[in-house]
Amino acid sequence: MTQMYCYQCEQTAKGTGCTAFGVCGKSPEVADLQDLLLYVTQGVSQYAHRARALGAIDKDVDVFVTEALFTTITNVNFDEERIEGLIRKAGQMRDRAKKLYEDACRKTGKTPETLGGPATVAIPATRDAMMTEAAKHGVA
């Protein structure tokens, strides 16, 4: 079992966060996958924010960001496969937002910024690889 640190809800013991297993029933694996989902979603948002500043908006990207964030703040669905699917979709949405941003830059004569971190992290092909990647970006 991996180390866990989850502090997102009011159910945490003594208000300090859960470190072994969530009081709500969340497993350390789900917490890790949620951390990775948040990290990749930050990359989506980095591009979407810059595109929006140039007047380019993709409502599907915006809806996805909301869906991803909502997935991590509600303690009602700890389906690892669903979260894994959202991580993969986050990679697709990030690529879509990047293209939107780069196209907006071309149209406005701006040079696109070179982003790093969550804007460039590779989406792992397997669950095990996702868990390894999540360990690099979580709060535990």
Enumerate the predicted regions with their spans.
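Metallocofactor- and cofactor-centric catalytic cores in central/energy metabolism, strongly enriched
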Residues: 1-140
